[in-house]
């Protein structure tokens, strides 16, 4: 059995990487490695996970320089030889070790009006949305976000402009802009326009490249750019 | 700046970029043809002086540059230097005026 040489970030933002040696196994995930360190080597290691099957979005970390969901990332796919470097997500404050404070990430989703605003009441009939309609298909394309923060950590524009809403918040806004039942389209387009919103995106597509759910926040942001332009030309912003 | 204002600036930058894509291509083709055709400076001026077409073309070119370049510099100032707000906006507006004035003077010099 070979051994993995693992560097793991310890401490807060002014911390440093510490070396660990972890037995290597077949089909071993990066989360398995972190869990081994915490349970067998150093119980003070702080990290976050929940479902372990790629549903909850809790376990994202920086692995060999790139943000990834660690529960669905096999060591064999990302290790350089027998070496791994595991750190907290970028663009977020480090609480301790591999745990980041994701408050700003979720706050930005609210700033982008990422909450559904119903137009119907419980006494109304169900809304009938045709599955093949263009709006429904556009909403479908963006709807499976698990809020892992990988796109946010990968985004260069977030690093340059901390006010930028980021790919996940804009992706969520695009889902709701295409939701025909929603009643806050105009407010939402105003919330996502501007130099902290969709118009700041440089279309590097790093978010799309890194998204573990294979979504395209870049396409969602392009959609928001189009809709905000039409809204501006109609005087609705 | 308001969402409406920022969106309008974005529209201005993207629209000016489309204009520049055409203008730069035409300009480069014109320069290449002029150089390979062996035209002297006097020959070129003979064709441009009094030409409303060349005056309009390069006038539009200058206008697009004076819109596009300051907006790009504004973004660079914001993202790379952290300069945001009224100061950089005013500086970029002055750059726009300067580019427009210098460009139109150059157009006037070869077309009037």
Label each region the model flagged.
Chain B
Residues 1-112:
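Membrane-embedded alpha-helical bundles that constitute the cytochrome b-like, heme-associated redox core
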């Amino acid at each position: 059995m070979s051994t993995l040489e693992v560097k793991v970030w310890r401490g807060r933002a002014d911390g440093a990487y510490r070396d660990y040696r972890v037995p290597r196994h077949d089909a071993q995930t990066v989360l398995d490695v972190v869990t081994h360190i915490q349970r067998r080597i150093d119980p003070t290691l702080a990290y976050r996970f929940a479902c372990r099957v790629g549903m909850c979005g809790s376990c994202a970390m920086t692995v060999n320089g790139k943000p990834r969901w660690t529960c669905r990332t096999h060591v064999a796919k990302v290790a350089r030889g027998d070496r791994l470097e595991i750190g907290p997500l970028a663009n977020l404050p480090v609480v301790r070790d591999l745990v980041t404070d994701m408050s700003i990430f979720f706050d930005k989703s609210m700033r982008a009006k990422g909450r559904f605003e119903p137009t119907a009441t419980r006494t109304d009939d169900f809304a009938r949305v045709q599955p093949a309609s263009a709006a429904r298909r556009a909403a479908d394309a963006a709807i499976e976000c698990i809020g892992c923060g990988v796109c946010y950590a990968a985004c260069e524009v977030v690093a340059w402009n901390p006010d930028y809403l980021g790919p996940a918040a804009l992706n969520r806004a695009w889902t709701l802009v295409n939701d025909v039942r929603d009643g806050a389209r105009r407010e939402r387009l105003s919330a996502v326009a501007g130099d902290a919103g969709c118009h700041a995106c440089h279309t590097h597509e790093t978010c799309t490249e890194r998204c573990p759910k294979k979504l395209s926040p870049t396409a969602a942001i392009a959609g928001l750019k189009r809709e905000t332009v039409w809204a501006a030309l109609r005087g609705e912003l | 700046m308001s969402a409406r204002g920022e969106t309008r600036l974005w529209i201005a930058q993207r629209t000016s970029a489309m204009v520049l894509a055409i203008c730069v291509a035409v300009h480069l083709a014109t320069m290449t043809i002029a150089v390979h055709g062996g035209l002297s400076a006097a020959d070129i001026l003979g064709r441009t002086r009094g030409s409303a077409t060349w005056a309009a073309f390069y006038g539009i070119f200058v206008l697009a540059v004076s819109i596009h370049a300051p907006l790009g510099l504004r973004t660079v100032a914001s993202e790379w230097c952290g300069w945001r707000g009224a100061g950089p906006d005013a500086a970029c507006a002055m750059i726009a005026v300067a580019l427009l004035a210098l460009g139109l003077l150059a157009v006037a010099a070869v077309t009037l």
